[in-house]
Amino acid sequence: ASGGTPTRVTTNSAKEVPYAFSNDGSTIYFGATIADPAQSALFPKGSMEELYAVPAKGGRYEQVLATPAQFISFSEDGKTFLYQDRKGGENEWRKHHTSSITRDIWLYDTATGKHTQQTQWEGENRNPHFAKDGKSFYYLSEQGGTFNVWQMPIGKASEAKQVTSFKTHPVRFLSAAD
């Protein structure tokens, strides 16, 4: 495809990181540090961005979550999305990191506002993507020694299964396509 003319859809000078389109393509979800709510316990910091949505044709953006929610993946019906959290400023390239700020995968229900932690392993878990069945998801984890692709049924961390088994070089930046 030849593409089209680029159109600016946001006007804030903050760093913005695109994460996903809505399933119908009408909305872009992105992370940025624009406006932490006054009641937020997080210190405003460029690496601890909030989640925003903006119409794909441009317009006013709105804050979806005040907490860092990165690399989101919507369920087919668009009622829930998976995301990786960010609890602190650890270097994302550090290998074999286990601490209280390692990333976990969460499920967010857009109707109720409920966040449900999906991964329970103490190390890094990243880049969630809903599986076609809608009942499980794929993600990256260092649980097997280096980053590999794992699959887990929603809400069943004990049933997580390693899909790839690379030993020398980790899998980075998992993506999915139809």
Language-model-detected regions and their locations in the chain:
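Short coil/turn segments that connect the beta-strands within blades of beta-propeller domains
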Residues: D24-S26, D77-K79, D133-K135
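A flexible loop/linker signature enriched in serine peptidases of the S9 family
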Residues: A1, V9-V17, S22, S26-Y52, ...
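Structural motif
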Residues: K57, D77, A131-D133, Q143, ...
